[in-house]
Amino acid sequence: MQNKLSCEVKRNPHTPKPLHPYTPMPSVRDTANIIFNLVPKLDSQQDTEIVDLWAANGRILATPVNSTLDFPHWDNSAMDGYAVRYEDVHNSNAEQPVSLEVVAEIPAGYQPKFTLQPGQAARIFTGAVMPSGGDTVVMQEKTRQENNRVFILTTPKPGEFVRLKAAYYQAGTQLLPANTQLNAAEIAILAASQCPQVKVYRRPRVAIFSTGDELVTLDQPLQPGQIVDSNQYALAALVKQNGAEPILFGIVKDNPTALGETISKAIANADIVISSGGVSVGDYDYVDQILASLGAKIHIRSVEMRPGKPLTVATFPTPPAPIYLGLPGNPAAVLVTFWRFVQPVIRKLGGLAKGWEPVFVKVRSHDELHSDGKRETYIWGSLHLVDGLYEFHKAGGSHSSGNLINLAQTNALAVLPLGETFISSGKDVLVLQLPI
């Protein structure tokens, strides 16, 4: 999509830019609802691709998959033991065992070509095809074999330990509905049904860039006042973790023209655009101005949340029309806002019908938790199993939104709602579970 930039900002860079007109900050819940409702409905004809089953792990089905086979494919044994005719053994027990002639051995993968006659049994192994005439399996622990005869030491149930053909599903049965994520169990089902390829939604393309004159790449020597751009690495890892394809646009300086060119390229090549930095109200935060000049509708400019107050959410009027998510610049705030808002968008846009929403659980807090109560506050830490119950342990050290060191082992975020300033040790707290 080629957009003519009408975003020439010719003012003196030291002249204060117009501030956004005051609008009340939406709550975190309202913000999430607004963002999630912006995710477009996928087209199962256009937004898809065919992949081999070997490459399908983590992908999302675009269409239902029906079985072409009965499963099991044939009557087979669920145990190592003896295939028998129930009418021969229905009165057998340990005190008066029935004796049967063992006429064959049936290993797995062998097709028996005989019929069990009255008074006969066949040694059989788990998964092996039942012989004609046999309708019950007696597990070997309930038998005693002497030479070519077997003694049945129990009273079996009719049909016991026999898996009947098509007992699990018949040819034509829907195995998996559309919008199912394919993991090990789902792939096993498809493989057992001889399904070599599947139609899946293509991976969402996510453009990522960072803004700021102070940013440098990790291979550049640091000068006073400079910091390494860690956000792009973190966001790319999170995007991949959620089944999407990151497209990296690097570092963009605090220059309206450069920023406009980058955003134009990003929205032409991606389904979601994520930027970090440049969305606050400082003199060098240009993102909202550029978006407006490109015709974007800005839905959100900030959120009642700590960390992560600066947040820009925008959409574009003409296709391709990606969702723009402008995150804060501070590294911890980037991660928290990604987990709370961006991750569900990627998963929903990837085709998940359910399971894309954030997962909140209530657990016991091991530590005292504090907030000023002015915004919904997210405190990072980890869940530990203690005496059979999960506890939230607050990460040690500084919880400044610029500090990364204690985020490394985080697997949960404790949530203190707006107006709540304190949760004492041992009390319940709501936590957002994070992907491991």
UniProtKB/Swiss-Prot annotation:
Pfam families membership: MoCF_biosynth, MoeA_C, MoeA_N
Coiled-coil segments on the chain, per record: none
PANTHER family linked: GEPHYRIN, MOLYBDOPTERIN BIOSYNTHESIS PROTEIN
Taxonomic source organism: Nostoc sp. (strain PCC 7120 / SAG 25.82 / UTEX 2576)
Pathway: Cofactor biosynthesis; molybdopterin biosynthesis
Annotated protein name in UniProt: Molybdopterin molybdenumtransferase
One term under GO cellular component: cytosol
Root EC class: transferase
Note on how the cofactor is bound: Binds 1 Mg(2+) ion per subunit.
CDD domains: MoeA
GO biological process: Mo-molybdopterin cofactor biosynthetic process
InterPro entries from the UniProt entry: MoaB/Mog-like_dom_sf, MoaB/Mog_dom, MoCF_biosynth_CS, MoeA-like, MoeA_C_domain_IV, MoeA_C_domain_IV_sf, MoeA_linker/N, MoeA_linker/N_sf
SMART domains reported in the protein's UniProt record: MoCF_biosynth
Stretches for region Disordered: 1-24
One annotated GO molecular function: metal ion binding
Catalytic activity: adenylyl-molybdopterin + molybdate = Mo-molybdopterin + AMP + H(+)
Known EC number: 2.10.1.1
Keywords: Magnesium, Metal-binding, Molybdenum, Molybdenum cofactor biosynthesis, Transferase
Presence of keyword Magnesium: yes
Cofactor(s) listed in the protein's UniProt record: Mg(2+)
SUPFAM superfamilies in the cross-refs: MoeA C-terminal domain-like, MoeA N-terminal region -like, Molybdenum cofactor biosynthesis proteins
Lineage of the species this protein comes from: Bacteria, Bacillati, Cyanobacteriota, Cyanophyceae, Nostocales
Signal peptide: none
Function: Catalyzes the insertion of molybdate into adenylated molybdopterin with the concomitant release of AMP.
Biased composition (Pro residues): 15-24
